């Protein structure tokens, strides 16, 4: 595949200069092929290629060229918030051309009018869906859509929104899809009305292999029929030490957090034999100790690991800890990260070698049942192998128990194509949300007009019709849709559901519980919200089940279900309710983490979700004019974000004051913003002169 020099591109010289400043002189094969297929002519394209093959630059060239020649706005859409930050920082390069980049994610109940001043907007699929529902006026200026990580169409949770966004995007402008390699790329490209650019080119060649026991050690057998031996008692440790001793970095993937943490602790015991940058590692370890958004135990644990060049990484860690670990690995100071597979789908973090420690993971719905990981997951993990500019080859190895299992794994993962992408709108929850989204963003429709959008989905036609009929009936029956003069429109209740961006089953569950019950205890409200489809899920041990039920001293809004699967959701929601209850009653964070066996990242995720759900519950109660419930939920919402009792609500509204500082001030008779302004010297004495002065100024602004 021929490459193209950037000097030969029909681009503004200022664009060429920025590329040269980045060190780019020649486009790589996927980029060159995208140019040949019409990228700079505004053609719709679906680009499928491996990780780190330069797809982001394809999007940049397409967007910048279009904006400079045609005007308007472009939107770059990702499935993950971490990726929005990464892309936002990359696109800021173009501000010297007068092209401003903005970023938005989360906070679904707003139209983000401030974004009208930006040319490129980086956001998530869910956020764009919510912006369309809010009919943000500036969206009318958007005519170029980049659909990043488009293989997320196949993700059971994110896929429905990706598909819904793609359907509307292709009706509104030019679409550029960027995806990992997929087996039915031609079909998906046709669905997007786009030309396919498909390539398996990688910047660093990948050696794929399998490692299994043989005599006194382990043998690594590669796809190219070469092999080599590594020695030790454990395959992961033996292989990892072999790579690290040669100056490489290793990403080890384990199927659970516990396995990731234990594997990291095992590896670190052998790192004394490896040459490390001790001073830099000590500096990183000290940074970990200083992180404010993490628990003491996890900081201490990681501190000791990082001193020897090893860390673990999973969603249970706080963002502050994850950021330090990621940046230290990028800077090549950390040598080994042991992670759960979520890292493979997130930020760009390549290593010389990838070890896939488990090909099975627990089935979320069937207790005790293990599933083989999809081929796509294997490709995503193995695709992290090889750092451009540092490694001649990347290596990805799968750990298996014996030669017989090696043969099966070889056929399933190393020799197979990834699974074809299929619609994930095939559930009541996903499809009904899709119908709400279309009416909210596109306006009232006849059933025939609405059916035209349904025909645009990737669902088989008969299945789509079935869901359409049942969905329409259910949404009309539950007062979410109304039919007026042959047009389907949103009711007041339906509009609020759409604006809040909650699942319709969540809204109906809340409504039915609140209408049926008088005022309840705080645990009852928190449990109800956590039990909805939008509620956070968390593991509960058998011992915890009994303790949670024994601790319950008030009546819940939801009856205990007999179904085993539903009971697991019910008890998980009860655990979440108690976590949040302790949080809003100002229990110390370390105590909460220890009591419930969760990480600081888990706590933050639970708080963020319950912040949104208490806000949503309060607004649902408001629409239904259920004043008693509304008042309780409104106060709960005010307390959840900062984790405070009712008397501290006014104090934590002041920027710079969190739960600890608010309680300190309250204990010294400073109970509201006015008290801060009237007692500046006392505040400075309690909080220190610099912070105290800042807080006094902020309090004055609050009451102005």
Curated annotation (Swiss-Prot):
Enzyme Commission code(s) on record: 5.6.2.3, 5.6.2.4
One GO-annotated biological process of the protein: DNA repair
Helicase C-terminal domain sequence ranges: 235-439
GO molecular function, one term: DNA binding
Short motif (DEAH box): ranges: 148-151
Known cofactor(s): Mg(2+)
Binding, ATP: 31, 49-56
Top-level taxonomic group: Archaea
Region (Binds Hjc): 366-645
Region (Inhibits intrinsic ATPase, and helicase): 646-704
One Pfam family linked to the record: HTH_61
Keywords of this entry: ATP-binding, DNA damage, DNA repair, DNA-binding, Helicase, Hydrolase, Isomerase, Nucleotide-binding
CDD domains with a match to the protein in the record: DEXHc_archSki2, SF2_C_Ski2
Mechanisms controlling activity: Helicase activity is inhibited by Hjc and by PCNA123 and PCNA323.
Domain Helicase ATP-binding: residue ranges: 36-200
Record function comment: An ATP, Mg(2+)-dependent DNA 3'-5' and 5'-3' helicase that may be involved in repair of stalled replication forks. Stimulated by both ss and dsDNA. Unwinds both leading and lagging strands in replication fork structures, unlike orthologs in P.furiosus and M.thermautotrophicus which only unwind the lagging strand and only have 3'-5' helicase activity. Preferentially binds dsDNA with overhangs or branched DNA. Able to anneal DNA substrates that could form a replication fork-like structure, has replication fork reversal activity (at least in vitro).
Entry protein name: ATP-dependent DNA helicase Hel308
UniProt gene name: hel308
């Amino acid at each position: 595949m021929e490459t193209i020099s950037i000097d030969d591109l029909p681009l503004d010289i200022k664009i060429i200069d920025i590329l040269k400043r980045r060190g780019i002189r020649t486009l790589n094969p996927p980029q060159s092929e995208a140019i040949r297929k019409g990228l700079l002519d505004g053609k719709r394209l679906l680009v499928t290629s491996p990780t780190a093959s330069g797809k982001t630059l394809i999007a940049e060239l397409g967007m910048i060229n279009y904006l400079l020649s045609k005007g308007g706005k472009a939107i770059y859409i990702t499935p993950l918030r971490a990726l929005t930050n990464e892309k936002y920082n990359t696109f800021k390069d173009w501000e010297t051309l007068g092209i401003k980049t903005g970023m938005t994610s989360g906070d679904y109940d707003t139209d983000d009018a401030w974004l009208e001043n930006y040319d490129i907007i980086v956001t998530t699929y869910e956020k764009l869906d919510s912006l369309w529902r809010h009919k943000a006026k500036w969206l009318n200026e958007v005519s170029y859509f980049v659909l990043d990580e488009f293989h997320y169409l196949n993700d059971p949770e994110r896929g429905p929104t990706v598909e819904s966004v793609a359907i509307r995007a292709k009706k509104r402008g030019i679409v550029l899809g960027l995806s990992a390699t997929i087996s039915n790329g031609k079909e998906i490209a046709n669905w997007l009305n786009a030309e396919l650019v498909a390539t398996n080119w990688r910047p660093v060649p990948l050696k794929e292999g399998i490692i299994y026991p043989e005599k006194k050690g382990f043998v690594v057998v590669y796809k190219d029929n070469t092999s080599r031996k590594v020695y030790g008692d454990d395959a992961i440790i033996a292989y990892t030490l072999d790579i690290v001793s040669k100056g490489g970095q290793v990403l080890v993937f384990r199927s659970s957090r516990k396995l990731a943490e234990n594997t990291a602790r095992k590896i670190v015991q052998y790192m004394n034999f490896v040459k490390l940058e001790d001073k830099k590692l000590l500096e990183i370890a000290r940074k970990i100790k200083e992180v404010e958004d993490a628990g003491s135990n996890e900081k201490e644990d990681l501190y000791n690991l990082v001193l020897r060049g090893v860390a673990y990484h999973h969603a249970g860690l706080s963002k502050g800890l994850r950021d330090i670990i990621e940046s230290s690995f990028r800077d090549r100071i950390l040598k080994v990260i042991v992670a759960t597979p979520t890292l493979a789908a997130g930020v760009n973090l390549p290593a010389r070698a990838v070890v896939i420690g488990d090909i099975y993971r627990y089935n979320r719905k069937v207790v005790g049942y293990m599933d083989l990981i999809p081929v796509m997951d294997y490709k995503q993990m193995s695709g992290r192998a090889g750092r451009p500019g540092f490694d001649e080859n990347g290596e990805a190895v799968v750990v298996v128990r014996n030669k017989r299992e090696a043969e099966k794994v070889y056929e399933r993962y190393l020799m197979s194509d990834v699974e074809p992408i299929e619609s994930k709108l095939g559930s009541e929850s996903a499809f009904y949300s899709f119908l709400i989204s279309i009416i909210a963003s596109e306006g009232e429709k006849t059933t025939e007009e609405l059916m035209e959008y349904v025909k645009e989905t990737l669902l088989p036609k008969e299945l789509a019709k079935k869901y359409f009929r049942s969905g329409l009936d259910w949404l009309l029956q539950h007062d979410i849709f109304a039919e007026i003069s042959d047009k389907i429109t949103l009711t007041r209740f339906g509009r609020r559901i759409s604006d809040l961006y909650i699942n319709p089953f969540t809204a109906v569950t809340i409504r039915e519980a609140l209408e049926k019950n008088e005022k309840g205890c705080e645990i009852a409200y928190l449990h109800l919200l956590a039990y909805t489809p939008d509620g956070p899920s968390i593991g509960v041990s058998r011992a915890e089940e009994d303790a949670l039920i024994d601790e319950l001293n008030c009546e819940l809004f939801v009856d205990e279900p007999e179904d085993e699967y539903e009971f697991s959701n019910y008890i998980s929601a009860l655990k979440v309710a108690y976590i949040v209850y302790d949080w809003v009653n100002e229990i110390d964070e370390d105590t909460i983490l220890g009591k419930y066996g969760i990480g600081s990242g888990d706590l933050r995720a639970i708080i963020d979700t319950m912040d949104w759900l208490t806000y949503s519950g309060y607004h649902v109660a408001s629409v239904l004019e259920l004043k008693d419930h509304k008042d309780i939920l409104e106060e709960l919402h005010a307390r959840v974000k900062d984790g405070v009792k009712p008397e501290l609500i006014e104090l934590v509204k002041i920027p710079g004051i969190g739960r600890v500082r608010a309680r300190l001030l309250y204990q010294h008779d400073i109970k509201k913003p006015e008290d801060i302004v009237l007692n500046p010297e006392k505040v400075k004495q309690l909080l220190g002169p610099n912070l105290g002065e800042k807080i006094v100024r902020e309090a004055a602004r609050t009451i102005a």
